Regions:
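Short structural boundary motif marking the start of a folded domain
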Residues: 21-23
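Secretory pathway targeting signatures of secreted, lumenal, and periplasmic proteins
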Residues: 26-128, 159-169
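Short, well-structured beta-strand
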Residues: 103-111, 115, 124-221
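Boundary at the C-terminal end of the N-terminal hydrophobic targeting segment
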Residues: 16-18
Length: 221
């Protein structure tokens, strides 16, 4: 009976995950697209038609996201919409909603991002990685939708916290692109029993959402 109950619970969880609505992100220049769960939060919302119609002379600094308007899920001491040390220009960035784990303070942020590494002018520089990286591991190469990427595990550390995750580099049509997942954690200490633990199941949920976006990435031209 216990085995049957466990099977049914797992089956329902898998069904629920699969049934989560997906959205499609297409870059403003039509270069790439990917699908992402509508659970994720857009850290870099695209300009709307109304924004585009507003005369440039009437725009003020309030028309652009400020530090105060950044969603909580996208905010961290470290870089979340680019690899730490990558110095890239973020093109897309989606975060897992922080409020889902508000009672688990060790979870700070988790994002999937796409950035252009403008300083990498050729394939060798691009695929060698950024000189300012703290490289945890270099994992070789992989293929995502017929495009080859070199994989690095990169991160950063500070007092009572840190971040890490994979960075995927490719040189496409004369430009260097980096896809990545970064997870930020707090190592602050709490009295036993005062907070809940961020579990393996929690991490599986977060990583699954972000990797779905990563694995659906495709260049359109």
């Amino acid at each position: 009976m216990k085995a049957l109950i466990a099977f049914l619970v797992c089956g329902l969880a898998t069904w629920g995950y699969a049934q989560t609505p997906l959205k499609t992100f297409t870059s403003s220049d039509g270069l790439f697209r990917f699908s992402y769960s509508d659970v994720l939060i857009d850290c870099l919302p695209q300009p709307t038609a109304a924004d585009s119609a507003t005369p440039a002379t009437s725009k003020t600094s309030t028309d652009h996201p400020s530090a105060l308007s950044i969603p909580a899920a996208c905010a961290s001491q470290g870089a979340t919409c680019d690899g730490p040390g990558s110095e890239g220009a973020s093109v897309a960035c989606f975060a897992y909603p922080k409020e889902r784990f508000k009672d688990k303070p060790s979870f700070v942020a988790a994002t999937f991002y796409v950035s252009e590494i403008e300083s990498a002018k050729n394939k060798k520089i691009c695929m060698d990685g950024s000189p300012d990286w703290f490289v945890i591991n270099s994992k070789g190469v992989t293929t995502i939708n017929h495009v080859t990427f070199k994989i690095f595990e990169i991160g950063d550390n500070w007092m009572n916290g840190g971040q890490s995750g994979p960075a995927y580099r490719t040189f496409h049509n004369g430009k260097c692109y980096e896809l990545g997942i970064q997870t930020v954690s707090s190592r602050a200490e709490y009295d036993p029993g005062t907070v809940k633990e961020f579990s393996k199941e929690d991490w599986s949920e977060v990583e699954g959402r972000l990797r779905n976006a990563l694995n659906s990435f495709v260049f359109l031209k």
